[in-house]
Amino acid sequence: MMPAKKTARKRRVKKHVESGVAHIHSTFNNTLVMITDVQGNAVAWSSAGALGFKGSRKSTPFAAQMAAEAAAKSAMDQGMKHVEVSVKGPGAGRESAIRSLQATGLEITAIRDVTPVPHNGSRPPKRRRA
């Protein structure tokens, strides 16, 4: 039997991108932050779960803040300076993620809400009693 071939993982190429789009997807359970170039190719991403937050802590504004900070730092290492922000979803981490992006030093040029709104599609889940 032949020994298993080691497949070398492709090294991540540092892209030098000046401006891009920060996609913030904030759900009731988690917040995902992905920073892409203008064409939509991923430059950096992070999420509350990827940073080690588990369970109900993932859905907090603080977790969203940390996720946005981590993604922004990674993008700034690759030369990112200006971002447009597109926010999707009803979660708690929307505003804190935007503030965190600004605090890390990225210049925010525009903020868009791209939350999909159904034209009376499928029935929503039952109302939350919180």
Swiss-Prot record:
**Organism's domain of life?**
Bacteria
Task: State the UniProt keywords alphabetically.
Answer: Ribonucleoprotein, Ribosomal protein, RNA-binding, rRNA-binding
Check the record and name the Pfam families matching this protein.
Ribosomal_S11
Instruction: Region Disordered: list its residue ranges.
Output: 111-130
Q: Which GO terms describe its molecular function?
A: rRNA binding; structural constituent of ribosome
- Which Gene Ontology CC terms are recorded? ribonucleoprotein complex; ribosome
GO BP, one example?
Answer: translation
Task: Tell me the SUPFAM superfamilies matching this sequence.
Answer: Translational machinery components
Q: Which family does it belong to?
A: Belongs to the universal ribosomal protein uS11 family.
This protein's assembly is summarised as: Part of the 30S ribosomal subunit. Interacts with proteins S7 and S18. Binds to IF-3.
Function, in words:
Located on the platform of the 30S subunit, it bridges several disparate RNA helices of the 16S rRNA. Forms part of the Shine-Dalgarno cleft in the 70S ribosome.
- Designated name of the protein: Small ribosomal subunit protein uS11
